[in-house]
Amino acid sequence: TRSGGACNSHNQCCDDFCSTATSTCV
């Protein structure tokens, strides 16, 4: 899985959790 990428418009990441604080995948 990838981390650190931007979340999409639905605040979702492909395989990771979206950090709403930084709007990035964690």
Curated annotation (Swiss-Prot):
The lineage of its organism: Eukaryota, Metazoa, Spiralia, Lophotrochozoa, Mollusca. Disulfide bonds join C7-C18, C13-C25. It comes from the Eukaryota. GO terms for molecular function: toxin activity. This peptide corresponds to allele E1l. Has not been merged with other alleles since they may differ due to geographic variation (see strain in PubMed:19606224). Expressed by the venom duct. GO terms for cellular component: extracellular region. The gene is E1. The presence of a 'disulfide through disulfide knot' structurally defines this protein as a knottin. The cysteine framework is VI/VII (C-C-CC-C-C). Belongs to the conotoxin O1 superfamily. It comes from Conus ebraeus. Keywords: Disulfide bond, Knottin, Secreted, Toxin. This is Conotoxin Eb6.15. It is found in: Secreted.
